Amino acid sequence: MSRTKDPAKQAEDLREKLRYHEHRYYVLDDPEISDADYDVMMNELKALEAKHPELLTPDSPTQRVGGKPREGFVKVAHSAPMLSLDNAYNEEELRDWARRVEELSGKAEIEYECELKLDGLSMALRYQDARFVLAVTRGDGSIGEDVTLNLRTVKSVPLGVSSATLKKTHMLGDFEVRGEVIFPTKSFEKMNEDREKQGLAKFANPRNAAAGAVRVLEPNITAQRRLDFYAYFLLVDGRVHIDRQSEALDTLEKLGFKVNSNRAVFKSIDDVLKFIHKKEEDREKLPYEIDGVVIKVNSTALWQRLGFTGKAPRWAIAYKYAARAAVTQVEDILVQVGRTGKLTPVAALKPVPIGGTTVSRATLHNMDEIDRLGLLIGDWVQVERGGDVIPKVVKVIDDKDHPRGKKKFKMPERCPECGGHVVRTEGEADHRCVNANCPAKLRESILHFASRGVMNIEGMGDSLVNQLVDRGLVKNVADIYELDEEKLLSLERMGKKSAQNILDEIKGTKKLPLERVIYGLGIRMVGERTAQFLAEHFGSLDGVMKATEEELLEVEEVGPRIAQSIHEFFAEPSNRELVKRLEAAGLQFKGVKKERGTALAGQTFVLTGSLPTYSRDEAKKLIEDAGGKVSGSVSKKTNYVVAGEEAGSKLDKARDLGVAVIDEDALKKLLGK
């Protein structure tokens, strides 16, 4: 017990001691005192702060847990985008990336910093005046959710940094730490054992459990989950200020953050690959889940020179380990109906653990895939799951230990949801329900419209959408904008605050850009990327609606089938009426038209092989920005074939047809670079 008479000094001494021992226990994993001794100090500080409330500080160890349950999460813009990384799945792809880095940077020797890719939830922590003030989830990379109260309960998150430490590390401004919230394997297994004893459903995997724990509305529940936080990125006053990533990680450790010790710096890709393969061998021994290794250019000065692609930095890449697999039995084949009416066969599997997740379903894509596999109900199959990819059936096992099934699957002629006719258009692999009023199509179209990356309407999930459709409150996505408090309060488990939160979320969608609106319409074959290209090319939804198929073909990545799909969608009167109602609701129907150059206007290019400095996507974008068009196949209409290393059959065909073959340097000259 402290004998200091001054309560303020006594409280500060206790806080310093508790922070020190929390760091020893939760960050260094090297405690110096027993839990009982720690509890004595904690209780002494609680009593002192209760007696002298004016002494309570936001970064006190007593303030980790507590607070009333919240109604929802506030959305917060990131100080700088939290971008995803490009992936490499084999040695060749990693070497291609390294070669591009060397060419673009103009450096023959590059230092590569390697870190384990933890399988958790990305998080940004902000510190002002050395105190932890905000935690934001990654969200869509631009906007996340404020989960500060929950992250305060994670013991490896420092609530503050001492002035002495700041001075020692030359941290002169406010700073932001990015990292991964994970569920350590032992804690996860213990929690699932406890849930099983209580008759509760077990969590499928540590990543999902961590994400769920971060997003519960009661911080006390987060505290019970014993999560961990590993830091991997440091921003000071919104910018990178340390010369090397390896030094930034060292600084994070000095600031009191937990940083993964499985990291190293190498000067050759050969050594990087040795590190990658060694860590894959050690994977099962680690106290947490990983799904690969992140490789970064160590020099942060080169980060500026290398820059970014559309969604990822050029100075980093994630080497993803091969999918984990297991053998199990197909108990049945079910059919799901999607928002475009597509019928997708799904294998109902005997539950099997794969990479920390219990898998009981696997997509079979379409009837052609079932025929290719030669799959029968009752067969034993190999199932793979990699990262967030939906589990898939890779092959049928046919040996004496795994007898073949007997029952052949047949695609239904009537929709399992509405009984409508099912058709398969000539030249397509998919079967579709043609009933425009199919409730399954309606449900899926609304879920798509409300999903993250589209309109991002928080709270509009399966349960709410099912009620809205079943009660006839929503018959298309435009009806969402006619919902009011009275309609929402008529639904089960809906209170005033929840109803208001949903209405606020719906109102917020009116500020989202044109490409989100186009993507949200659910036009068949129009994904997020194509929607963005349409918005950039035409600059308004009216321009897209009025475009002919020929005009649509001028848009990047739009081929004949996509052009036909877009044209047919807007030719349908009910869809035009839907668009009219969405415009009346106040959604963004105008964007910024991206003007393209004319240097390569009217020229058609085909890319083949690996180019020295450009990735295929980068070369394609440069050509299209200059007014050219990139095709996937060589024909007499092709003007140039751009050939790199290991060019394939397209090069042979170009020579046969007499099409000009050029290399990357020649392409740069055509581009005026």
UniProtKB/Swiss-Prot annotation:
Enzyme Commission designation: 6.5.1.2
Catalytic activity reported: NAD(+) + (deoxyribonucleotide)n-3'-hydroxyl + 5'-phospho-(deoxyribonucleotide)m = (deoxyribonucleotide)n+m + AMP + beta-nicotinamide D-nucleotide
Taxonomy, superkingdom: Bacteria
UniProt domain BRCT: residue ranges: 595-673
CDD domains xref list: BRCT_DNA_ligase_like, LIGANc
Binding site for Zn(2+): 415, 418, 433, 438
Keywords: DNA damage, DNA repair, DNA replication, Ligase, Magnesium, Manganese, Metal-binding, NAD, Zinc
Active-site residue list: 117 (n6-amp-lysine intermediate)
Binding site for NAD(+): 35-39, 84-85, 115, 138, 180, 296, 320
Cofactors, names only: Mg(2+); Mn(2+)
InterPro entries assigned to the protein according to its UniProt record, in alphabetical order: BRCT_dom (IPR001357), BRCT_dom_sf (IPR036420), DisA/LigA_HHH (IPR041663), DNA_ligase (IPR001679), DNA_ligase_CS (IPR033136), DNAligase_adenylation (IPR013839), DNAligase_N (IPR013840), Hlx-hairpin-Hlx_DNA-bd_motif (IPR003583)
One Gene Ontology molecular-function label: DNA ligase (NAD+) activity
GO biological process, any: DNA repair
Entry's family note: Belongs to the NAD-dependent DNA ligase family. LigA subfamily.
Matching PANTHER family: CHROMOSOME TRANSMISSION FIDELITY FACTOR 18, REPLICATION FACTOR C SUBUNIT 1
Name used for this protein in its record: DNA ligase
Phylogenetic placement of the source organism: Bacteria, Pseudomonadati, Acidobacteriota, Terriglobia, Terriglobales
